[in-house]
Structure formats: C-alpha cells, structure tokens
C-alpha cells in the first residue's frame, strides 16, 4: 500500500449533516453510524454527495473533509 492510499491515523474532522465532528483514523461509515446511535435504523447516507449502500458502510473508510449527510425514513400519513 503506498502513502496516498494509507488511511488517516490521527484525529480528523468531517461534517455530518452540516455539523463538524471529529473522528479517529480508520473510522468507517459503519463506525460513525454506531457512534451516532443509528445502527439498525432506516437511514440513507451520502458521502460527498454519493449515496453509500448499507452493504458498503463497513468498507467505506472516512477521510478528513468528508461531508456526510444522513437521512432517516419517517413514516406517517
């Protein structure tokens, strides 16, 4: 693995629904979902405007400056 593909190891900042949040290097989208208490909920997530399927959350490693948008499905009528 070359230096350009190494994950960030120290603390870094991302944006979650427009709010700054600090994470530690190697944090995946699944890690973020767990930290936010959203595991198992009906949500849709986009990182830098690209929708990330639930099956890819564990593999999607977050990077400094990523913009994460999380939408939760709400039922009603």
Task: Indicate where each model-derived feature is located.
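Ubiquitin-like/PB1-type beta-grasp interaction modules and other compact soluble beta-rich domains
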Residues: 1-76
């Amino acid at each position: 693995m070359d230096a350009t593909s190494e994950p960030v190891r120290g603390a870094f900042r991302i944006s979650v629904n427009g709010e700054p949040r600090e994470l530690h290097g190697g944090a995946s989208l699944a890690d973020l979902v767990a930290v936010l208490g959203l595991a198992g909920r009906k949500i849709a997530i986009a990182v830098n405007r690209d929708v990330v399927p639930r099956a890819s959350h564990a593999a999607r490693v977050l990077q400094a400056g990523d913009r994460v948008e999380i939408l939760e499905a709400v039922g009603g009528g």
